[in-house]
Amino acid sequence: MKFGIVVSEWNANITGALLDGAVKTLKKHGAKEENILVKTVPGSFELTFGANQMMENSDIDAIIIIGCVIKGDTPHFDYVCMGVTQGVAQLNATGDIPVIYGLITTNTMEQAEDRAGGKLGNKGDECAITAIKMIDFVWSLNK
């Protein structure tokens, strides 16, 4: 299995922890370092472009997008979250490999920390498990 991970640099303390969780979980389930391609993009809105480029230009079986958007005082949060969600849905509807949604959307930094290795676990771990399961699903159909 070959995995691609596209990570937003924005809120790097959160996205870094999510990335660490995802990579550790992939390795725990047998993925080799050389079969995990990690690329960064500046912000969460660029995640779908990065995933699309990875899909078109890499030999990958599944892609995980990792980002963190924390609500502020303007509608920017809503636009970014909706754009990324629609972008990932479009990639999954039209692409040949699964794109796993690892965008953390919270009201506060504390809520994000809770989901990035804090009291609610690490959503990066969950994304890695989902990627493995989706590769298994695709491979089971191609036998």
From Swiss-Prot:
It is an enzyme of class 2 (transferase). (2S)-2-hydroxy-3-oxobutyl phosphate binds at residues 73-74, 115. HAMAP family: Lumazine_synth (MF_00178). It comes from Bacteroides fragilis (strain YCH46). GO terms for cellular component: cytosol; riboflavin synthase complex. Its EC number is 2.5.1.78. Belongs to the DMRL synthase family. Pathway: Cofactor biosynthesis; riboflavin biosynthesis; riboflavin from 2-hydroxy-3-oxobutyl phosphate and 5-amino-6-(D-ribitylamino)uracil: step 1/2. It catalyses: (2S)-2-hydroxy-3-oxobutyl phosphate + 5-amino-6-(D-ribitylamino)uracil = 6,7-dimethyl-8-(1-D-ribityl)lumazine + phosphate + 2 H2O + H(+). 5-amino-6-(D-ribitylamino)uracil binds at residues 10, 44-46, 68-70, 101. Coiled coil: none annotated. Catalyzes the formation of 6,7-dimethyl-8-ribityllumazine by condensation of 5-amino-6-(D-ribitylamino)uracil with 3,4-dihydroxy-2-butanone 4-phosphate. This is the penultimate step in the biosynthesis of riboflavin. InterPro entries: LS, LS/RS, LS/RS_sf. This is 6,7-dimethyl-8-ribityllumazine synthase. The keyword Transferase applies. It holds the Pfam family DMRL_synthase. The active site is at 76 (proton donor). GO terms for biological process: riboflavin biosynthetic process. Keywords: Riboflavin biosynthesis, Transferase. The keyword Transferase applies.
